[in-house]
């Protein structure tokens, strides 16, 4: 595929930053798949101690606890007041974040991570061990970007079709209720 490099060469890990007084907090339950589904407003003075990773647009967040769940995301928001839990490794990509996210979601990569995890009930990897894992990446930055864009577009299509499916399922359920309002199931004895 290209060059074998460590993750530490692909991204800056856990960049230092000063937290804002009020921020939107993303904990480990907030990300499902590659989507941020929820967040909550916190103040710096009363926030959980794990609220430490100030997000910047384009940052990739990798769930270091139970990484087999593949709840990792790219932060696409322009706002500068979002903070993630230290349960995520924060990767600030050297090149294309979507390409890195695609690699992180790859089952072979997950196996490499699990081999380096500690703990059995809640396997976890620390950011330094994650940064030391070697990956093969294209030398050409444009190729990385095209690969990342390709998989981002596929993910968008999947999401769109999932929403259509969910909507049609609700329509079907409503129509069945309307067409058969008093249908009673009769059990034979």
Regions found by a protein language model. Give the residues of each.
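Feature detects amphipathic, helix-rich regulatory segments
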Residues: 1-189
């Amino acid at each position: 595929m290209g060059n074998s490099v460590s993750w530490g060469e692909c991204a800056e890990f856990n960049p230092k930053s000063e937290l804002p007084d009020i921020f939107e907090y993303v904990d480990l339950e907030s990300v499902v798949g590659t989507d941020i589904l929820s967040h909550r407003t916190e103040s710096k003075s009363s926030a959980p101690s794990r609220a430490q990773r100030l997000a910047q647009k384009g940052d990739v967040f990798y769930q270091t606890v139970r990484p087999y769940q593949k709840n990792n995301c790219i932060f696409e928001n322009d706002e500068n007041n979002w903070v993630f839990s230290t349960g995520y490794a924060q990767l600030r990509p050297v090149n294309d974040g979507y390409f890195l996210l695609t690699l992180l979601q790859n089952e072979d990569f997950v196996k490499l991570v699990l081999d380096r995890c500690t703990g059995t009930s809640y396997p976890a990897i620390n950011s330094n061990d994650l940064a030391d894992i070697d990956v093969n990446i294209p030398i050409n930055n444009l190729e990385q970007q095209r690969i990342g864009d390709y998989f981002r577009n596929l993910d968008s299509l999947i999401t769109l079709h999932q929403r259509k499916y969910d909507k049609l399922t609700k329509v079907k359920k409503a129509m069945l209720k309307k067409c058969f309002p008093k249908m009673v199931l009769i059990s034979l004895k």
